[in-house]
Amino acid sequence: MKKIFILFNVFNIAIFAQVLLPFFIINSAFSQYKGNVNKAESYLNKSELKTDIGEKRSLLIDAKGEIDLAMTIEKNNIKARSWYVQANIYSAIARQFLDIDPDAIEKATESYKSIGDKIKTNDVTLIQNANVGLQNLSSHFVNQAIFALQGSGEPNYEVAYEEFVNSLKIYPQDTLGLLYGGYVAEQLYKYDVALDFYAQLIKMNILSKKNTNTIYQNSINILFNHCNLFDECDSFEKSIKLISEGKNIFPENNYYPSIEINIAMRLNKVDDARNKIDNQLKADPTNASLHFNRAVLYYNLG
């Protein structure tokens, strides 16, 4: 009976260990941290002085660990300054070490935006600093994208695209990010993304005439040249809608009537194509492209 009792207790201890072990592991992850906001900020400040990437990384990991624990404590979580420190820490991680936390951009953005909104404060300077921090983080990604395109050697479209997308996580309606992000997406054959970015810009209707014309033409070209990707080849319905809008905004621009002719020819609408070509030639009798299209049309008719 004694042996059975011993075995029973050994069995219980084993189960007890299995139950408590995860708790000890999770708890030990925080054991080196005290949940002190000032200490978290101190780690961040030290990291900014380091030139060695390894040292900087290690300090930011500690800053993250300290602030993560601190923000679970109610007295810290209700203070705007705590959110500001958290935002700055995640902003620093987002700039160089996204592998530490892939959601660092979103966390920094949410923290900055919470100050003065979700987290009330009368500290106007702190609210202003939070806005500046948010703008600086966005500018960082935009500058990285531009450098990838224009820095040296061949443009790195992959890096540029990634950085523009990062900037749009902060300001989703940033016109620069949408405009150039759309252009870069085209270079990477991400036509659905490019169309989405351009559609947002068209809806916002705040670009210059030149850039508005560009996004209309780019959108139409994508739909026309890659109609199979967008279920367009049988009708070109989306293309025609954009062409109609473009013609209303830019009535003197020959691109829109010309692409209309190309669509009519693709759809084998012979009479429609002929009439459009003849009307365009009356307005622009020296247009070589129109004469070529007319010749092709009559050649195909036999």
Q: What are these model-predicted stretches?
A:
Residues 1-37:
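Bacterial Sec-dependent N-terminal signal peptides
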Residues 32-49, 76-96, 122-152, 176, ...:
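Amphipathic alpha-helical repeat scaffolds of TPR domains
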Residues 53, 60, 105, 154-157, ...:
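TPR-repeat structural position
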Residues 57, 93, 98, 102, ...:
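Structural motif corresponding to the intra-repeat A-B loop/turn of tetratricopeptide repeats
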Residues 70, 115, 167, 201, ...:
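Canonical positions in the second alpha-helix
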Residues 73, 118, 170, 204-208, ...:
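Structural marker of alpha-solenoid helical repeat scaffolds
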